[in-house]
A protein has these predicted regions:
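Glycan-processing catalytic domains of CAZymes
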Residues: 1-125
Length: 125
């Protein structure tokens, strides 16, 4: 029987990424997995937000989760981002999707033509 919480997703960022930003005056060491477990979510979108992370190490920690998605904002500009996600999904079957997050900042002033996204959805595993 499906449960509603099986449909909830949490947006995860590297621990401490938003310390002292957006009115958050305290420091947080909570990892994305800890946040998901605390909130009772079984699915997580991981968005590093410009932080260079050890993708494999995070994926190891995400093994208790039902589904994991990673930000692939730059996949239309650089196919290597999508290829890395596909390679990681071979070792971690709970990686089920890629997420296009924000199109602000650099992408707001240097938009990617929509046709560049056409080939992304045709990759199947």
């Amino acid at each position: 029987m499906a449960h509603l919480r099986d449909r909830f997703w949490i947006w995860g960022h590297p621990e401490g990424r938003y310390n002292h930003e957006f009115g958050n005056e305290q420091e947080s060491r909570m990892t994305p997995l800890e946040g998901a477990l605390y909130m009772g979510a079984r699915n997580l979108f991981m968005v590093p937000v410009g932080v260079n992370v050890n993708v494999r190490q995070y994926n190891k920690s995400f093994t208790p989760l039902k589904s994991v998605g990673w930000a692939i904002d730059n996949a239309a500009a650089d196919p290597a981002a999508l290829n890395q996600l596909i390679e990681q999904a071979k070792d971690y079957p709970n990686i089920t999707c890629g997420v296009f997050d924000d199109f602000v900042g650099y992408l707001a002033t240097h938009p990617i033509p929509p046709e560049r996204f056409g080939g992304i959805g045709c990759v199947a595993r």
